[in-house]
Amino acid sequence: MRAQDAGFSIGVPNGWRRATDGAAVCLIDPAGRRAVAVAAAAPEDPDRMAYWQREENDLLHGAGPTGYQRVDISPALYRKGGADWEYRYDADGVRWHVLRRAFAAGNGKAFVISWTTPDDEWDRNQRDFRTIMQSFESR
């Protein structure tokens, strides 16, 4: 299935449903156990590592998620460069694992793609995540 928005298209497995969360387009598997969210990001912020550090700081000084644990904030070797923020948190009796990738897509556009799965399913879902990321196209 291919999800399209004004600024991008991305492929996800058949049967996933589309939802929105603010400005983000969310695509959720039928069981509600895996999700990918895509949102436009500020292209004028070239230091994506600093961007994630600020986001984490804001999260920790606000009403952050229960059980927040940073896994890493690191450079991402994706497209025109970017950074990943990976973390875990607890919600609804589940330990969740998230990777948020901020990157420049060209044509003055930048995006954040977030991938969320239960922590105990993280490793076996990485192939799907790589396939989804490879399918991303900026418009």
List each model region and its residues.
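Conserved polar/disulfide-associated segments of primarily extracytoplasmic proteins
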Residues: 18-127, 134
